[in-house]
Amino acid sequence: MVNQRVVHLCAKRSFSLTASMQKYFVDVYAKPDLVLTRGRGSRLFDDVNKREYIDFVAGIAVTSLGHSDPAIAEVIAAQSATLVHTSNLFHNSEALKFAEKLVESTKRFGGQQDAEKVYFCNSGTEANEAALKFSRRRALRTDPQKQGFIAFENSFHGRTMGSLSVTSKAKYRLPFGDMVPHVTFLNIHDPVEKLVSFIVENAPKTAAMILEPIQGEGGVHRVPEDKLVALGRLCKKHDIVLIYDEIQCGLGRTGKLWAHSNLPADAHPDIFTTAKALGNGFPMGATVVNSKVNEVLSVGDHGTTYGGNPLACAVGNHVLDRIAQQPFLDDVKAKANVFTAGLLALQKKYPFIREIRGDGLLIGVEFTVDVSDIISKSRERGLLITAAGPNTLRIIPALTIEEDTIRQGLEILESVVGEISSS
């Protein structure tokens, strides 16, 4: 009875606190009544309610090196005591180091082989905005009719107007009226021949194609290699700038440095974007381009006040130093195998698990039912997990998650799935 009373009082205190906080927030989020106060590794803590959670979300694929990583804390402390911000009116040494490191490590690990230059910004949507602007600039230098963009259904590229315009979900776009014009959405699951036919017909008015090698929010769907090769060859043939959005699927999440690493050169993009894990929670984004794109850019064509600041780049240097190591990437694959084995065992017991898919530690678990109850009941039992559509769980933990923690989280998930299956 005493414990029940403590839980009840904690719940009241949590509700009171979250209600007072919500009073000052714009109404664009639907958050549960918990208040996260600290984290360590793959654990998060709500000290208001005296709760501990296993984290399978990692800030939506952001904290790839875990929460409150001691080494990152040291980097932030040291750099913030040295130099935080200068603007892009001047060079800073951390940005210079990081740009070189990002380009060269991309090539070394089998990614974009003609990567040449980097534009730093503060988020994924900004990185995609830059990619769209750069590609339109490139196209208009050769033909004023090439203004269109090809994107794909179930895509997500960001919330600002440009990246939102190439995000397919109507619920995100329609409340804001007209978007950037000349955007066409194709179905990435269509046969290659159908995609090729449309692209060839519309190539004279198409500036760029943007896609996620693995669709994240759209349900964790991996684009087959042969399709990426075909699209890459087609874009090169018709002078269409190819953009890969690697914001969620990149930087080690698949057990490769980039999701397009080790693909044939024909499938490599002209531009790829990254953010999320790049700063392990510190706001940072980057747009990596080849010479074909860079050669048309001039001073003043684009810019940012904060992008590439010394503090962000110091963190980025540290993150990349740790992730761009083959043993680290191999360890991601090993942990993915632990997840896959556990989830396949779960699927055998509960047939309403329709499919398990993804790559590395970007995993989708599709059910025949809505997953909102699974998410809420898991949270009640100490596991944080998120969705990718109405009937798909998305598992995107820290890349450093321990195998014991994986198994503990899967035990919680199994208890919830078992309860829902029998109800």
Swiss-Prot record:
The keyword Magnesium does not apply. Pathway: Amino-acid biosynthesis; L-arginine biosynthesis; N(2)-acetyl-L-ornithine from L-glutamate: step 4/4. Its cofactor is pyridoxal 5'-phosphate. GO terms for molecular function: identical protein binding; N2-acetyl-L-ornithine:2-oxoglutarate 5-aminotransferase activity; pyridoxal phosphate binding. Pfam families: Aminotran_3. It is an enzyme of class 2 (transferase). The modification N6-(pyridoxal phosphate)lysine is found at K276. InterPro entries: AcOrn/SuccOrn_fam, Aminotrans_3, Aminotrans_3_PPA_site, Class-III_PLP-dep_AT, PyrdxlP-dep_Trfase, PyrdxlP-dep_Trfase_major, PyrdxlP-dep_Trfase_small. It is found in: Mitochondrion matrix. One of its GO terms (cellular component) is mitochondrial matrix. Keywords: Amino-acid biosynthesis, Aminotransferase, Arginine biosynthesis, Mitochondrion, Pyridoxal phosphate, Transferase, Transit peptide. PROSITE patterns: AA_TRANSFER_CLASS_3 (PS00600). HAMAP family: ArgD_aminotrans_3. PANTHER family: ACETYLORNITHINE AMINOTRANSFERASE, MITOCHONDRIAL, AMINOTRANSFERASE CLASS III. This is Acetylornithine aminotransferase, mitochondrial. It comes from Eremothecium gossypii (strain ATCC 10895 / CBS 109.51 / FGSC 9923 / NRRL Y-1056). The lineage of its organism: Eukaryota, Fungi, Dikarya, Ascomycota, Saccharomycotina. The gene is ARG8.
